[in-house]
């Protein structure tokens, strides 16, 4: 992926969302097609009987009187809109449903090119500007507010009763547009029959304060981006707005939008209350709170994510907690990458089954598909009947004298010490995939401590959720601890595999009230915060983002610990910088637990 300024690439990704998606080729209705329905491949079960579409736009008024801008795409034959009642698939858009850029109009079909094939197969496609954004009226109150969720219900039901609708509605979209699907499902709208959230999250607190550490750089960038989109870079007006006065009036309301960065900076704990709204944002505006309601909805849910995306942990947890009809696919992607799979085929298989009643076999397949990074291309995609994989062996790799191995320490007094280097960083959040790659990590590793295995005698597959157990002390009252899992090749170059992080004062654990796959749950309540006693060791349990990686024979596995991640986290800087000590003695052993597959 080419490098470019982060802000510009984020803006382009959010507004145009032009990603490298494979588009299923349309099959003429006169051509007999072999029936194929397997993971990533689909033909012969439904035909591309339409040859085009028409776009229209209008306002729809929701329950509180707010007008939302809606784009509708309806299939055509020989230029004539079909009179057939068809299923509808829609997205609740935060980054403008349509815009004009350098004289060209961009719509949702540019963001998701495979939707053109969905239209040809007999679906109505819709995109709706969220309140306070695009051409919609209203005010942005914060991410996934109660009003936004009300809107999702109202739009779903409006789409379900239109004369051109079959009454069966689905949802699609990635990132913010995936969160909104979970929240829509939690309201159980009668016409919502299937959702397909891509790279979406479940726990807002873990997104903003992962391990209790503020992810400020990204949320500040995001807030600036949406401010520009909402106020300075207007969306395309709806058809009825011939003179642009409606759009101008909507943008005037957007000027009262709240800043997400201002909201979250003032809410450092899971139970923090937003002063302006009186809401516990991390409780009331986040999907994980509504697991019970989403389960009760029974709405079929296809979860899709990437190993190098920031939300992959959440998607795996959601999948395991839902008893809805469900599927989980995890590929070799960051937040914005989309290769190695025909996304259009998977969406069409899902919607044909649930919105048209076509028995294409998708529900008889293994429910989990995952890509093993580093495996031969022919065998990289694999399937399983459950997540985590039933075949995983939780294997402890103990920290030694710069070594990492499977033999527990027996000596006493063993420890490693370093001074926090606040310049440490991997890259400006490469998990978003917005122009920043994962660099070679040797220089980064030198700013902390590393422990490395000998060269592997054979390949080792790690598929699942790594967990670090560290005994750590500090010369200060707190510490931000960043843990990295890496693969080191024969030349000594180190490649990023995964990471986890935890503020030491946020180390308390509790029962989350749902299945967290055996991972540590740090509740992050204000009352849970416990400062360190200088030079007194405490145990930290830190889960890393899940991965599926084949460590090659001859390569080495490395664990690195640093005390900062400058580009991605707001770690308070102290002078002098504190010393951190990682203990690895018999009574206070530290280790990395890896989910090893096979021998």
Regions found by a protein language model. Give the residues of each.
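Conserved alpha/beta-hydrolase "acid-adjacent" motif
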Residues: 310-315
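N-terminal cap/lid segment of alpha/beta-hydrolase-fold proteins
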Residues: 39-84, 452, 456-458
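Accessory cap/linker subdomain of secreted extracellular hydrolases
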Residues: 28, 43, 108-112, 120, ...
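Alpha/beta-hydrolase fold nucleophile elbow
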Residues: 163-175
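Short glycine-enriched nucleophile-adjacent loop
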Residues: 177-189, 470
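Short beta-strand/loop motif that positions the catalytic acidic residue
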Residues: 297, 303-305
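C-terminal, loop-rich substrate-recognition/catalytic regions characterized by aromatic stacking residues
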Residues: 28-30, 251, 338-599
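Cap/lid segment of the alpha/beta-hydrolase catalytic domain
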Residues: 79-160, 489-490, 518, 566
């Amino acid at each position: 992926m080419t490098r470019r300024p982060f802000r510009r690439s984020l803006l382009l990704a959010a507004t145009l969302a032009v990603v490298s998606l494979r588009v299923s080729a349309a099959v003429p209705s006169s051509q007999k097609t072999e029936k194929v329905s397997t993971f990533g491949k689909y033909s012969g079960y439904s035909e591309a009987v339409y040859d085009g579409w028409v776009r229209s736009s209008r306002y729809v008024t929701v329950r509180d009187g707010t007008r939302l801008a809606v784009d509708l795409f309806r299939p055509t034959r020989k230029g004539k809109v079909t009179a057939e009642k068809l299923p509808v698939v829609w997205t609740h858009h935060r980054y403008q449903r349509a815009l004009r850029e350098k004289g060209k109009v961009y719509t949702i079909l540019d963001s998701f090119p495979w939707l053109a094939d969905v239209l040809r197969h007999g679906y109505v496609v819709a995109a709706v500007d969220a309140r306070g954004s695009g051409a919609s009226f209203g005010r942005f109150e914060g991410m996934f507010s109660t009003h936004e969720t009300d809107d999702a219900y109202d739009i779903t039901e409006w789409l379900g009763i239109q004369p051109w609708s079959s009454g069966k509605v689905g949802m699609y979209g990635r990132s913010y547009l995936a969160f909104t699907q979970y929240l829509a499902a939690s309201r159980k709208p009668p016409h919502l029959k299937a959702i397909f959230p891509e790279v979406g999250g479940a726990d807002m607190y873990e997104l903003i304060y992962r391990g209790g550490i503020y992810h400020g750089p990204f949320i500040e960038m995001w807030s600036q981006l949406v401010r520009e989109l909402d106020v300075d870079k207007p969306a395309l007006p709806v058809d009825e707005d011939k003179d642009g006065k409606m759009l101008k009036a909507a943008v005037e309301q957007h000027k009262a939008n709240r800043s997400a960065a201002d909201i979250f900076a003032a809410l450092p704990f899971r139970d923090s209350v937003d002063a302006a709204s009186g809401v516990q944002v991390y409780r009331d505006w986040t999907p994980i709170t509504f697991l019970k309601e989403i389960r009760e909805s029974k709405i079929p849910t296809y979860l899709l994510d990437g190993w190098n995306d920031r939300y992959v942990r959440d998607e795996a947890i959601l999948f395991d907690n839902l008893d809805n009809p469900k599927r989980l696919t995890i590929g070799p992607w960051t937040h914005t990458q989309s290769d190695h799979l025909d996304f259009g085929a998977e969406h069409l298989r899902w919607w044909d089954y649930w919105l048209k009643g076509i028995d294409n076999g998708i529900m008889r397949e293994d429910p989990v598909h995952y890509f093993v990074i580093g495996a031969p291309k022919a065998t990289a995609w694999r399937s399983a009947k459950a997540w985590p994989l039933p075949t995983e062996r939780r294997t402890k790799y103990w920290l030694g004298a710069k070594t990492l191995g499977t033999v527990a320490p027996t000596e006493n007094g063993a420890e490693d010490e370093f001074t926090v280097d606040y310049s440490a960083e991997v890259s400006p959040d490469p998990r978003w995939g917005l122009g920043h790659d994962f660099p070679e990590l040797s220089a980064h590793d030198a700013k902390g401590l590393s422990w490395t295995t000998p060269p592997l005698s054979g390949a080792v597959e790690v598929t699942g959720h790594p967990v670090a157990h560290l005994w750590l002390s500090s010369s200060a009252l707190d510490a931000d601890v960043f843990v990295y899992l890496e693969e080191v090749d024969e030349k000594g170059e180190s490649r990023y595999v995964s990471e986890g992080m935890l503020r030491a004062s946020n180390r308390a654990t509790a029962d989350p009230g749902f299945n967290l796959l055996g991972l540590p749950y740090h509740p992050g309540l204000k009352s849970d915060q416990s400062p360190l006693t200088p030079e007194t060791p405490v145990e930290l349990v830190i889960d890393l983002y899940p991965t599926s990686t084949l460590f090659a024979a001859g390569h080495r596995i490395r664990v690195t610990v640093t005390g900062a991640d400058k580009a991605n986290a707001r770690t308070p800087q102290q002078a002098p910088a504190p010393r951190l000590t990682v203990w690895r003695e018999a009574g206070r052993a530290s280790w990395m637990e890896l989910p090893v597959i096979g021998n």
